Amino acid sequence: MAIKVGMVSLGCAKNQVDGEMLMANLKNAGFELCDDAALADVAIVNTCGFIDSAKQESIDEILELATLKKEGRIKKIVVTGCLAERYREEIHKELPEVDGVFGIGANADIAACIESAMNDFTESFPEKSKMPLCGERELSTPSYFAYIKIAEGCDNKCTYCAIPMIRGGYRSRTMESIEKEARGLVENGAKELILIAQDTTRYGIDLYGEYSLAKLMRRLCKIDGLKWLRVLYCYPDALTDELLETMAEEEKIVKYIDLPLQHASARVLKRMNRTGDRESLTALMKKIREKIPGVTLRTTLITGFPGETEEEFTELAEFVKDIEFERLGCFAYSQEEGTPAALMPDPIDDEVKNHRAEIIMESQMNIMDRLGEKQVGGDITVLTEGFDRYAECWFGRSAMDAPDIDGKVFFSAETKPYYGEMVTVHVDEAIDGDLFGTRA
């Protein structure tokens, strides 16, 4: 009788893709896949280890499954992903309920690892480079959109970030493998493809000797049936004119740039091992908007980095007000063991860090309210994602919104749309970052 396996995948979309490949490997090896890990023989926790809150979420999930194991509802618990890669010894020592701990390099041999864990505690930590860059996936997203991971690892070495330690150096996939996967996804119903990596803008530098994201995107735009092509996790240093021109010219590429800037103070950015200052970043945002009219700019910021003064925080807050990003996320700095920033002097009190993040987000909500009002009275294209039974209306995303991190468009419709259908919605109202309207 086949062993039933179920997965809980935590963290970012990149980790989600890893989990999808892992589950496909298990299916091909004869395991029975279970949608609910609580109903499986083996529960896999695909963990995130990026910041403290993500680590805690991973630990909480393991402990919740441990309760089910104690009750006899599941037989084994195995842990994979970033937390497993980074804290292998601690997991074994502090969480005795866990039957297997596997690093990211073990994904290719996950079937053998789990079979071993059925008999005795097992751990496997091959070289990170052994993690396959591509492969068959058991998709966890709806059929109408999918992520494509175009590279693994990171070479940027930001002082606050543990990803290079966890994931290793930057490794790009070939254009041919990405195009093949993209065509398969579109043939199976995907209307939107979302390119992801730790740093998408450096795609190809290791394979082709030059930044090749623009060439890749032009190639993907030729796929019949693809409606939207979106790219996340761009890095400001590598945002080339060729890429901006490609985004402006290609109709299938949504006019949306996710550009995590982290800060605007030159001193803070230098301590983060990032380049730029308020003036240069302001100029870059202006350039993007000039080259791509109507673009949606999304960024991510960090408050409370060690040594951040009131003046430097004020500079960041003023920068946010001046630029008026269409989408923005802000997080209090989380100290990561083993990173240079963890050893820096002048740490900021948690209460101060969190308060500064709240100030930024409050300011951003005011900006989004004003920008949302400008949408009222107009028509937008919406990718239908579901029906809200409480509000008795449909909802979906516009080209201005990426899954999970951005807002929604809620709309009424006399003609029932199907999931994944692209419909035109007349915007009647904007509230708290979401739009409300009627199918045109």
Describe each model-derived feature in a short phrase:
Residues 77-81, 86, 187-311, 322:
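Conserved SAM/AdoMet-binding glycine-rich loop
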Residues 178, 195, 231, 259, ...:
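Conserved, mostly hydrophobic/aromatic
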Residues 343-440:
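Terminal RNA-binding accessory module
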Residues 255-256, 269-270, 281, 293-296, ...:
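Extended hydrophobic-aromatic, low-complexity segments
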Residues 197, 233, 261-263, 299-303, ...:
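Active-site proximal loops enriched in glycine and acidic residues that flank catalytic Cys/His/Asp
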Residues 1-203, 242, 253, 257, ...:
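Proteins enriched for Cys/Gly/acidic motifs involved in redox and nucleic-acid/cofactor modification
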Residues 5, 42-43, 146, 193, ...:
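Conserved beta-strand core positions
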Residues 12, 204-225, 271-272, 335-366:
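Radical SAM enzyme [4Fe-4S]-AdoMet core and its adjacent flexible, acidic
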